Amino acid sequence: MPRTISLAVVPGDGIGPEVVHEALRVLREAVPADVSLDTTQYPFGAGHFLETGEILTDSDLAALAQHDAILLGAVGGDPRDARLAGGIIERGLLLKLRFAFDHYINLRPTTLLPGVTSPLASPGEVDFVVVREGTEGPYAGNGGVLRRGTEHEIATEVSVNTAHGVERTVRFAFDLASKRERKRVTLVHKTNVLTFAGSLWQRTVDRVAAEHPDVAVDYLHVDATMIFLVTDPSRFDVIVSDNLFGDIITDLAAAISGGIGLAASGNVNPTGAFPSMFEPVHGSAPDIAGQQKADPTAAILSVSLLLDHLGLPEAAARVTAAVSADLAARAAGDPAPRSTAEVGDAVIRALSTNH
């Protein structure tokens, strides 16, 4: 039955438009013949803010909410620009979208793809997914300052953990693990020190685990997790954690699997009540913008996550396979740098070959 995907596209700043352009080319090539793509571009980002004074208005949110999904490039301007200080774009755009659209799952697959060199001497088979809670923890904005600027200043940042928020995240992790070959969930926290929040997470995992007898479960403190990520990353299958620990884990996970230049992510609302957003993890790199130097691989892998989320797993697998083939060919062939468009061309050729 014919289907149309309504996609909001936010190219953003710096290299964002270049990598998104290639990601869209791959997406159009990957979707099945009975699926059409209807894209609407939005100008949000640092450049838009500097021109208009607006970051993301209520009417912007209402427009974005009408789409099936969002593809984001990268946002952020010149870090030396005082008008952009304090993470104003990241908070006003990315975090605002996350909370407004209840993106309570931050999904970060970590795979050491063929031809990619890990900084680890013997990484083994690296293939795991981090399920990070996305709307609570210390990022919820529950905190404040008293006596600012004095020697008696008090700053608080409260980590918010609700039974509802923890359970829906844990259930997502177990559902995901049950579909994977190794079927294993690792809870990462610091229950020996953060006893109140840690207890809530552990009790929730224990309760949900009882409903999934086919899924193995273990627990690691976050500091031990950091050690195992660099000494034995192949032990992990699905990691579930809170917002702060998940944020830290995912960056190290990207580093051991080739760097953030290859890392894709999904900010997901699994209920479908709002569109989920998919993006490369890397920044806007304004120093190389417009020079065709940026590698669009992470943006293309974000398209794979997008397709899988929209119920097109075969198309998603084809995109990942095409990226894997291109990375392997790069490692075996000419090491000379390729332009952004040339990488897109190569992935599309690989897609066509594996159709």
Swiss-Prot record:
NCBIfam families: PRK03437.1 (NF002898). Substrate binds at residues 98, 108, 132, 223. It comes from the Bacteria. HAMAP family: LeuB_type2. It comes from Clavibacter michiganensis subsp. michiganensis (strain NCPPB 382). This is 3-isopropylmalate dehydrogenase. Gene3D superfamilies: Isopropylmalate Dehydrogenase (3.40.718.10). Keywords: Amino-acid biosynthesis, Branched-chain amino acid biosynthesis, Cytoplasm, Leucine biosynthesis, Magnesium, Manganese, Metal-binding, NAD, Oxidoreductase. Mg(2+) binds at residues 223, 247, 251.
